[in-house]
Amino acid sequence: MFSRVLIANRGEIAVRVERTLRRLGIESVAVYSDADAGAPHVRAADRAEWIGATPAAQSYLDVEKVIAAAERAGAEAIHPGYGFLSESPELAHACAAAGIVFVGPGPEAMALLGDKVAAKDAAAAAGVPILPGLSGESLTDEEITAWAAGAELPIVLKAAAGGGGKGMRVVSDLVGLPDALVATRREAQGAFGDDRLLAERYLANGARHIEVQVLADSHGNAVHLGERECSLQRRHQKVVEESPSPVVDAELRERMGAAAVALLQSCGYVSAGTVELIAEREDPSAFFFLEVNTRLQVEHPVTEAVTGLDLVELQLRIAAGEELGFGQDEVRMEGHAVEARLYAEDAAHGFLPSTGRVASYREPAGAVGGPGGGEAIRVDSGIEQGSEVGLDYDPMLAKLIAHGPDRRAALAGLRAGLADLVVLGPATNAAYLRALLAWPEVREGAIDTGLIERLGAEVSPPPAAPVLAAVAFSVLLGPPPSDDPWDARDGWRASGPAWARARLAGPEGEVEVAIRAAPAAPPRERSHFCPDTDEKCEREDWDWEIGEDSGTFSFDGQTLAVDGEARELSIYGDGDAVWLLDGAAEPARFEVVEAVGPEGGVAGGGSLEAPMPGVVIDVRAEAGGEVAEGDVLVVLESMKMELSIQSPRDGVVAEVLVAVGEQIARGQNLIALAEPSTEEGTG
């Protein structure tokens, strides 16, 4: 076995490989670009090597830099992870030339199976069913057009060198074929440096994407580890995967597995590999070859969960020349596992990528990293609080995997894990995934590759409730200091609580909010909020108004009650903003744009109060001076804005209770006002 291995990747897969290396007592070497200096995968490694600037072409995709880093670190092997150079024959050749072991198949098998035309021919030769279509070394547009004219529509165009959903176009009519050919060739050239295409029948009435995990060693041993159902996709990319498939029985599993093993053995394949199949939705026994992934798959954890095996460990042992050590009859699949991919994307707007700093990150309670966690939620993550999510790399942030005794339990566990997950900052698809997993077709296993597209916005999580803006404002106002109503910082006064008003920016745009401590709730029953802690907080009751909406809510930092209905609500501070999470909707971030003073009136005893916490930056009143209604008496800096406190009536300043520079709390007395003198001079 190796003593030191370099991981030619980043993010969650690098962290996941590092876990296995650590368990095996193997030193790990991370690589990083400028953007990833200090990233979790770098800190988790025993050693790290810088390989270039942020763009992947200048770092993670640069074979020479990766090899040089391995040589500097004295690494005996390179594990490529997935993506980047994981299916690069060039890297495999370079490793061989440098005397470094590539943890994966040989370059010849990789090149053969990485070419869709050659792979399809190999599949047919090995007896794997293939879809009717047209393939050749260099098909012209004219050849494809002529074939399509006599084919059953729709058809799909695919990049011969492609994979991962890139370089694909579905063509439903011949009129759109010329434009589709141009666009697909352009995308194929840009993504793979190769514009060759193939064309084949497209299963228009819905298809299942089912793949088989295979392991093959250099001693002629090969086994399959069952199948994974990967039909829940958007833009031809997987979102949710599971094992086993809800529609594959033991007989079909053996047929699919035998076909996959036969194909890889016929190509001299050694390592972990995945044979992807496409099947009829209603009759999965009618399956066809799709492609081969010559690397570890993103969704490998579901196979690890049901088999109890560590696929990274097996990859390493095979690469070190060891035998598998078990046969097909020893492979056992226990229970059911489901994985959800957490993407930095806006599900409500076409799954567009999202960027930003991760303001807060919390994994589900009891989560484990890597295989071997039993039925606990497994999280493979490459982010943490403070991570910057940009557009330079894949938007996948993490994966959540749930394992249960059956499919129903696994789905329920995954939904619970997603509800307990906190990722604030860039938009993510977490709430969307929860809604998707609860959808009837998904619960019943009646899924296909077109389901997400057909559902569209139907499955979108609900928008944030209007009252959340009022709750956020109450949190931003800060806590009252004591049980003394005369010292309360909540706007309470003998004549009734005052309204605090502000304009907040939230997920639905800007909104004007007014709140006041509910008159029915004495101040002594209210306490402080506890954002970012697990402490139990006491209840606060508030009246609220937003446009034509109004009501009363109660909140204790964990449970929000509105009109008698209670739900869990979490608070996370983010500088001068606050995040609210209710488990169903997307996280909602609120920030005060403009603070507005309270309605007229003075506190008990004739004191003018602060509507918000802040710092006194100007005092314009003097003791004994007369003031008129509307005169500015004190100026506060609150929430990065200036707030002028005006006299609510004519009067005389009895006492100035604050000074410039003083930090004051919400509801604190600022100026004591007396009635204006009514005595007339005697002359």
In which residue ranges do the predicted regions lie?
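Short amphipathic alpha-helical segments
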Residues: 3, 166, 244, 394-400, ...
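Residue-level signal for inorganic ion chemistry
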Residues: 46, 78, 213, 436, ...
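Short, well-ordered beta-strand elements within core beta-sheets of diverse protein domains
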Residues: 168-170, 201, 248, 396-405, ...
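Catalytic cores of soluble metabolic enzymes centered on carboxylation/carboxyl-transfer
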Residues: 260, 301-549, 632, 662, ...
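Conserved nucleotide-binding/hydrolysis modules and their immediate coupling elements
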Residues: 541-568
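Structured functional modules or segments
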Residues: 598-683
